[in-house]
């Protein structure tokens, strides 16, 4: 079995109209992305939370998946009519062959070496180093497989600085990778928090796959004092380490919350921050922490700091 793939470029103003016309004509799927992707002309479509939303690309590349017997001439003419041209000036047509898509997807994910003693290993691979710590993690609904620089930065920091007996809050836990790693590195208790229920589901699945002790690892969508469960509330005593790998704007807004979650003298680790955003985040957190840039990778930074002594006002 095979399909046809039709690719062409149009102005972004026509994307919705063209997409509707293609689906009406029997398209199986319509994929739209920035025609300048990967070049100096690439334009962001969405900013991070708190950023302006009026960011759009000017040229869109559209890829349509069609049945093998689709009437290509009729479909191309329909697109040309929508954009007001007698014909599409340029397009590419290709055949898409049936493949083992699961195996093809799995082949894209190899074990990732984070440090001399830590690997992130998909479930369909054998651990490359039986003597090392292997986090069993499959790509899924939540962010965090170890492939992104910000995740690697956080894992490397935890590997170097977490001490047995530490207590950890992973704020914005995603897949649970940082929380699970903290437990494997010897943390006494770990709490992973995320506002996305899908992230909690993924984290719980990954915790089970890594044989984590449920009495030492808690995942929740709500921060105390909203959590009324006694066990959850007990786990939310101030911790010795807070790690948050999210984005710069949410981190800025969350600074007072994360400050209260730490014991005096506790350490905070922040990532998901571009080098160009580091100074702004440092300025905000310096009100409560002795902050510095701890590491950089591919334009991303890891900020780390220690909380001053005193109360939790």
Curated annotation (Swiss-Prot):
One BP annotation, GO: methylation
CDD domains in UniProt: AdoMet_MTases
InterPro entries reported for this sequence: Ribosomal_L11_MeTrfase_PrmA, Ribosomal_PrmA_MeTrfase, SAM-dependent_MTases_sf
Protein name: Ribosomal protein L11 methyltransferase
Keyword Transmembrane helix: no
One GO MF term: protein-lysine N-methyltransferase activity
Role played: Methylates ribosomal protein L11.
Residues that bind S-adenosyl-L-methionine: 151, 172, 194, 245
GO CC annotations, alphabetized: cytosol
Similarity remark: Belongs to the methyltransferase superfamily. PrmA family.
E.C. numbers: 2.1.1.-
Swiss-Prot/TrEMBL keywords: Cytoplasm, Methyltransferase, S-adenosyl-L-methionine, Transferase
Catalytic activity entry: L-lysyl-[protein] + 3 S-adenosyl-L-methionine = N(6),N(6),N(6)-trimethyl-L-lysyl-[protein] + 3 S-adenosyl-L-homocysteine + 3 H(+)
Primary enzyme class: transferase
């Amino acid at each position: 079995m095979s399909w046809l793939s039709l690719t062409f470029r149009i102005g972004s103003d026509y994307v919705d109209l063209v997409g509707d016309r293609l689906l009406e004509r029997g398209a199986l799927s319509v994929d739209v992305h920035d025609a300048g992707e990967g070049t100096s002309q690439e334009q962001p479509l969405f900013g991070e939370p708190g950023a302006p939303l009026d960011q759009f690309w000017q040229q869109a590349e559209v890829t349509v998946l069609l049945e093998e017997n689709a009437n290509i001439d009729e479909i191309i003419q329909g697109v040309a009519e929508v954009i007001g041209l007698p014909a599409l000036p340029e397009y590419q047509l290709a055949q898409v062959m049936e493949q083992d898509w699961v195996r093809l997807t799995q082949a894209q994910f190899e074990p990732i070496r984070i440090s001399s003693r830590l690997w992130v290993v998909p479930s369909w691979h054998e651990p490359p180093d039986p003597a090392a710590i292997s986090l069993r993690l499959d790509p899924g609904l939540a962010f965090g497989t170890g492939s992104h620089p910000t995740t690697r930065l956080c894992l490397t920091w935890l590997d170097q600085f977490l001490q047995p007996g530490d207590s950890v809050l992973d704020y914005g836990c995603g897949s649970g990778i940082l929380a699970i790693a903290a437990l494997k590195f010897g943390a006494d208790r770990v709490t992973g928090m995320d506002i996305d229920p899908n992230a909690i589901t993924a984290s719980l699945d990954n915790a089970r796959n890594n044989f984590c002790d449920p009495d030492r690892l808690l995942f929740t969508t709500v921060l105390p004092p909203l959590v009324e469960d006694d066990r959850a509330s007990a786990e939310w005593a101030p911790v010795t380490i807070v790690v948050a790998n999210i984005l710069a704007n949410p981190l800025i807004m969350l600074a007072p919350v994360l400050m209260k979650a730490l014991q005096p003298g506790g350490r905070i680790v922040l990532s998901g921050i571009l080098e160009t955003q580091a100074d702004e985040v440092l300025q905000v957190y310096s009100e409560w922490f002795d902050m510095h840039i701890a590491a950089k990778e591919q334009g991303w930074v890891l900020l780390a700091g220690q909380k001053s002594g005193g109360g939790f006002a």
